């Protein structure tokens, strides 16, 4: 998971949100007014600021393996529009509360799937995350990865968010093996360098990933983490 820098609210959404406030619509009813061209504009705005990566698992969205009848991109409400405590803070059309996410490993449109096989917001549903918020970088600082592609965290609340609520290590989803494959490719490229050349390669690669805007490299979170950890080891060994 990587930090998301929210951009400006699309004017089309602002207009709709103000009307919803005037009509005192519930978060769900307010969101139901977002449709057609307006919804497409909001979706595209979210995709661009996230570099076409899922806010939670970092896969490319839309994925190219989504079954017919399944929405390849979902608009997620960080604070659910139907929260378990029924709170209403205008979250239905609050742009700061909206994220673009993948289909969450939903295999078919007939709902013939197991809950434990789902990921991201499809598994999160209306549950509040304890701490993780991709729009607040400080909440992501304890995250680390394993070379087999699994995501983890030193902070137990963050780990619960990642592993239990978002199910980002789901064995039935391709995301773990895809994270592992992305890291393996990076390590293979690093094997061509040694000493100062390796340090320079890692620094250049790290900056390249961090500077990406739209169409970011899928699963770059594990790549950035690995490059930082290797650079830390290499620079410490030289002191």
Please report, for each region that a protein language model flagged, where it lies by residue.
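Catalytic cores of phosphodiester-bond-cleaving enzymes
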Residues: 3-8, 15-20, 32-33, 40, ...
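Hydrophobic N-terminal alpha-helices or hydrophobic patches in metabolic proteins across all domains
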Residues: 50, 60-71, 165, 175-178, ...
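Histidine-centered nuclease catalytic patch
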Residues: 60-121
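C-terminal, charged low-complexity interaction regions
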Residues: 156-239
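Long, low-complexity, intrinsically disordered segments enriched in glycines and aromatic residues
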Residues: 112-172
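A structural signal for short, well-ordered beta-strand segments and their strand-loop junctions
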Residues: 55-56, 74, 100-101, 142-145, ...
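Short, charged surface segments at domain edges that flank catalytic/cofactor-binding sites
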Residues: 3-56, 84, 89-93
């Amino acid at each position: 998971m990587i930090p998301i820098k929210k951009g400006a609210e699309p004017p089309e959404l602002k207009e709709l949100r103000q009307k919803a406030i005037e009509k005192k619509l519930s978060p769900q009813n307010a969101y139901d007014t977002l449709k057609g061209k307006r919804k497409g504009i909001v979706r595209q705005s979210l995709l661009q600021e996230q570099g076409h990566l899922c806010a939670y698992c970092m896969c490319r969205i839309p994925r190219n393996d989504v079954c017919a009848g399944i929405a390849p991109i979902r608009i997620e409400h960080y604070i659910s529009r139907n929260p378990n405590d029924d709170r209403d803070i205008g979250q239905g059309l609050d742009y700061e509360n909206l994220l673009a996410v993948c289909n969450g490993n939903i295999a078919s449109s007939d709902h013939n799937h197991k809950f434990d096989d789902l990921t991201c917001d499809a598994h999160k549903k209306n549950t509040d995350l304890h701490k993780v918020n991709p729009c607040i970088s400080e909440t992501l600082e304890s995250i680390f990865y394993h070379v087999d592609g699994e995501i983890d965290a030193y902070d137990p609340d963050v780990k619960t968010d990642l592993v239990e609520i978002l199910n980002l290590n789901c064995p039935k989803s391709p995301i773990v093996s895809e994270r592992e494959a992305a890291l393996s490719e990076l390590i293979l490229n690093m094997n061509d360098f040694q000493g100062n050349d390796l340090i320079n390669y890692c620094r250049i690669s790290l900056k390249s990933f961090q500077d990406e805007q739209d169409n970011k490299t899928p699963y770059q979170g594990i790549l950035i983490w690995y490059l930082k950890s290797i650079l830390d080891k290499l620079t410490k060994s030289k002191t």
